[in-house]
Structures are given as C-alpha cells and as structure tokens.
C-alpha cells in the first residue's frame, strides 16, 4: 500500500514512518509548513522550519521520499483566523481540534487521496482505530482532538503508534539512531511560537479595561485588564479581593463586563453542543463527555437531539464549561463524536 505519513519532525511520527516501512509499505513523508520564521528558543510547538528540516533528515535516514507543503495561507484562514475571531466573540477555542479537521489530518488525507493517490494517511497521534472506530489510547490519549474529524475521513486514516507508550517509541527511535529520539514534545499552540497567549491576542484584540462584577450581588469588585484575557473557570490573576475564592463565570463582550462568583455559579447540569460531528450512534448508558483535553470525563444522564444542537444532560454538575471548547462524547473508550460547546 501507498501510505503517506504526516511528519511533524517529532519522534512519534518518525517512528510511525519507520514501522510502516518495516511492514513493507511504500511510505511517503509529508510535512506541512505553516510559517517561515523560527520560534522562540525552547518553544514546544510543531510545524516550524526546524521541524521541517528534522522531518526531512529522518526521511533521508529511512530511505523514503519527503515532500513539504506550504500551507501557511490555508492554516491562517482555517485555524488562526478562527482562533482570533473566537476570542473576539468571548469564546475559548480549541485550535488543535479545528486543525485536525480542516488542515493537517482529515483535510490533508483528503488532499493526498486526490493528488497523490495514497491508500492511507498515517499520523503519530496516540489514538487507536479498531473496526473503523476511534478509541482511547492506553497512554497519552489524543482521541479528544479527533472529535471533529468527519466519519468518512476515518476510512483513510491510520495511527500506527496508538497502541504504544512514549517510552516504547523513544526506545525504537534510539535503537535505529533517529536524531529526534529525545526531542521534546510539542505542547504549546503552534502559531503562538512560544509567545504568551495574552501578548499574542493583544496584537489583534483591543484589551480595554472594564468592570469585574459579582454575578449574584451585582457589586463591582474591580477592573479587568481586557475581557479576552480571561476564560471561564479561571481563578487566579483576577486582581480582586474577596472573602471567598472567586472564579470567572461569565463574560459580557458587548458591555465589557467580567462576571465572577463562587464555585457554585460555575456548575452546569447540561451542556449544549453545536455543529455536532457524529461518528457513532449514541448508546443508552455508559456514555461520558469530555470538555477539555486531559479533563476528567463526566457521566451522561441522557442526550436530546434537535435540528441545530445536541443537548447533554449530566449525572453530576460540571465546572469550567467554556463556550468554544470541544465537547467529545464517549461510550466507554469509543469516541462517538463531538461538537462545539455553545
């Protein structure tokens, strides 16, 4: 089979390419370049010029062809612009999930199927695919980021390292002397390039001061430094004095008011998802929703569907439910789908 491997220049995708070549497949390394400048030193991001170079070196060592696609404009239109627009409207977006849908996983696979006649696109994600279904990996699970990937895209996606641990992957890389064997993981939002989120957003959004108001008493407690700097559930950095811990519970973008309150004002017993992406049918029980990467899954009582939204009723109240984040629904370890929290 002809298998393209989305190579980020990291150890996971490099070992994925090696394993597929060892299995006898025709492997092509594909790297996306999203920007031309280098990042800050020690920035834990991917898709930089240095990552492109690392991917090319690995492909040369493995004896497989390597191509680079300059998708800077596409990435800006589909991910960065979405990210900035979301913050401008008071949302807290998840750019990695959007990128997997619209750029580097689902769309890249579709693009290569059309232009290079590949059979599959493989990535280094910690995801298990069994019988066409996406399941949680045993370690460093990244299935949450696949919640928006269309069902039809799964036909041509594969995840060779999904069953492996990070240590097993690094051991293989060291055994075959890959130069990226000890490369640090990319964890930051890549297009921030090591910048602080507030500094990045201040380039595009007017950070005007406004009132911090208690949600229950309606008393003004202080001034915020720009409403877009804060996210739902945030406790630290509010700059107000109060006799109880306070959290960000609501943002009024039009009036530029940041509402805060005690933890009970964060509690939600239902979550609404828009633009729901169905991967599998809902089950009667044992379903959970995950509302942030690495957050604890929340048991679901039942689900109501209508023309525009999916409403998730919870068995226990959830906190830190931020509009704009991805809500991923699971049945046990199986990913059923996901949407944008609204």
UniProtKB/Swiss-Prot annotation:
One of its GO terms (molecular function) is tRNA binding. The active site is at residues 99, 190. The gene is mnmA. ATP binds at residues 6-13, 32, 124. Belongs to the MnmA/TRMU family. It comes from Hydrogenobaculum sp. (strain Y04AAS1). NCBIfam families: PRK00143.1, trmU. HAMAP family: tRNA_thiouridyl_MnmA. It is an enzyme of class 2 (transferase). Disulfide bonds join 99-190. It is found in: Cytoplasm. GO terms for cellular component: cytoplasm. Catalyzes the 2-thiolation of uridine at the wobble position (U34) of tRNA, leading to the formation of s(2)U34. InterPro entries: MnmA-like, MnmA-like_C, MnmA-like_central, MnmA-like_central_sf, Rossmann-like_a/b/a_fold. This is tRNA-specific 2-thiouridylase MnmA. Residues 140-142, 292-293 are annotated as: Interaction with tRNA. The record marks 125, 325 as: Interaction with tRNA. GO terms for biological process: tRNA wobble position uridine thiolation. Keywords: ATP-binding, Cytoplasm, Disulfide bond, Nucleotide-binding, RNA-binding, Transferase, tRNA processing, tRNA-binding.
